[in-house]
Structure formats: structure tokens, C-alpha cells
Regions:
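Exposed, low-structure sequence patches enriched in small/polar residues
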Residues: 1-174
Length: 174
């Protein structure tokens, strides 16, 4: 290129952990942010079946935010443990496509519950992940998506043999 490409970045991160071992309660919280500025973009075009990639001088920026809260509570006498995580994500920025600068935005919210029960005769585990997301590209809003994944596992030991039964269910909106 006829110019010197450069990128600047500003990053922030905060984490807090809380432990109350006697009460079997644990939690953590994290927040991160990132902002990037660049004076160049990569323009990719396909000509005669070949990829042509060129640097173009153009100021662009992007922002990423991520927050997460997780907690866990155990019940030792009952051989039971619960936990749940909540994650929120936001991203926006610009990309260069076919000689045009196009803006984008993405948001998502994730809920991740978990249950574990472990009496002397078995181990039962449930894990879920439920994600709601929304995107827009070039000022056009795309369809919201609600995807989830759930798993259930049962394990039992009979004499010296572990028997395990697992089920996994996916739901993806395309």
C-alpha cells in the first residue's frame, strides 16, 4: 500500500469472584470491553476465479462488550448442586465489502443452567444453554434467533461396571 496501515486498541476487563465455602455458594462476575480503530481495510474481490486482496485506506472502528454472571449453590446433605450462568454480548463495527463500507451489529443473551444430583447409587446431570441473538447488517435487521441445547446424563455403577445413558437435544433456528 501507499500508506502505513495501523490499528489502535483500547481494552478493559473487570472480574470479581465470591466464595462462601461453608454455605456452598460461589459466584463470579466479569465485564470486558474492547474498542479498535484502524486506518485500513482489506478489500477482497473475486476476478476470473482468483481472489484479489488489496489494502484500502479507510478509517474503521469496532466495539465489543461482554458481561457474564455465574453462580453456584450446593446442598451437601442432599447430594445436589445447582448453577446458572448469564452472558450478554454486544458487538458493532464496520467492514469493507465490494468497495463499500457496511455497518454491522450483533447482540446475544445466553442462559446456562446446570443441575447435578449424586446419591450413592447414581450420578444425574442436566446442562442447558439457551441463546437469543439479533443481528443487523448494512442497516437491515436480520431475523432474531433462539437456539438451545440441553443434555441429560444418568450414570450408575452396578458392581464394577459403570452404565451411562445420555441424551442431547439441539434446537437451532436457521
Amino acid at each position: 500500500p501507499t500508506f502505513m496501515p495501523h490499528t489502535n486498541s483500547l481494552n478493559f476487563s473487570f472480574t470479581h469472584n465470591y466464595k462462601r465455602v461453608v454455605k456452598e455458594f460461589f459466584s463470579n462476575f466479569s465485564l470486558s470491553a474492547n474498542r479498535m480503530w484502524s486506518n485500513s481495510v482489506m478489500d477482497m474481490q473475486i476476478q476470473n476465479g482468483n481472489y484479489l486482496m488489496t489494502y484500502v485506506q479507510h478509517n474503521t472502528k469496532s466495539t465489543n462488550l461482554n458481561g457474564r454472571f455465574w453462580f453456584s449453590k450446593g446442598f451437601y446433605k442432599h447430594h445436589f448442586k445447582t448453577s446458572c450462568g448469564i452472558t450478554a454480548t454486544y458487538s458493532d463495527g464496520e467492514q469493507y465489502t465490494g468497495g463499500k463500507v457496511l455497518g454491522y451489529e450483533y447482540r446475544s443473551l445466553t442462559l446456562s443452567p446446570s443441575l447435578t444430583y449424586s446419591p450413592s447409587w447414581a450420578y444425574i446431570s442436566y446442562n442447558g444453554e439457551f441463546i437469543m441473538s439479533k443481528s443487523s447488517f448494512d442497516n437491515a435487521s436480520l431475523t432474531s434467533r433462539f437456539n438451545w441445547k440441553q443434555s441429560l446424563t444418568l450414570t450408575s455403577t452396578i458392581r464394577k461396571v459403570d452404565l451411562s445413558l445420555s441424551g442431547l437435544y439441539y434446537h437451532n433456528q436457521l
